[in-house]
Amino acid sequence: MGINQWEQAEPGVKRKIHSPGNEVMMMEVVFEEGAEGSSHSHPHEQLTYCLEGKLAFQIDGKEVLLEQGQSVHIPSNAVHGVKALMPSRLLDVFTPLREDLLN
């Protein structure tokens, strides 16, 4: 996994981790229509901004629709997943650093 390089994350989903700071990092994620990010959780706090498209997030059992220009906060340890309702692109911001993605 390389910094500033696109990689396949899941079927229909690719991501690029941008160069991280000391305590915060960004990751761009592109979804084909119908592609899903499987449910997971992590101790990191996350902000997700929709650059384009429309997605349905499940965050701790609640559905949140996210469209271009909108953002959502995903608290630490919240179980979350997402499905793209159309081709979509997100910018995820994490703090502290996601060492699991960087190593």
How should each PLM-predicted stretch be described?
Residues 51-52, 67-68, 86:
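A cytosolic small-molecule/anion-sensing beta-strand core signal
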Residues 36-37, 56, 72, 76-81:
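Histidine-centered metal-chelating micro-motifs
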Residues 44-45, 49-55, 60:
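Glycine- and acidic-residue-biased ligand/ion/polar-headgroup-sensing regions
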Residues 54-56, 63, 79, 89:
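Structural motif
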Residues 1-23, 103:
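A short, N-terminal "cap"/entry segment at the start of jelly-roll beta-barrel domains
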Residues 27-41:
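Conserved short histidine dyad/triad with adjacent acidic residue
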Residues 61-76:
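Short acidic-glycine-tyrosine-enriched beta hairpin
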Residues 76-100:
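Ligand-binding loop in jelly-roll beta-barrel domains
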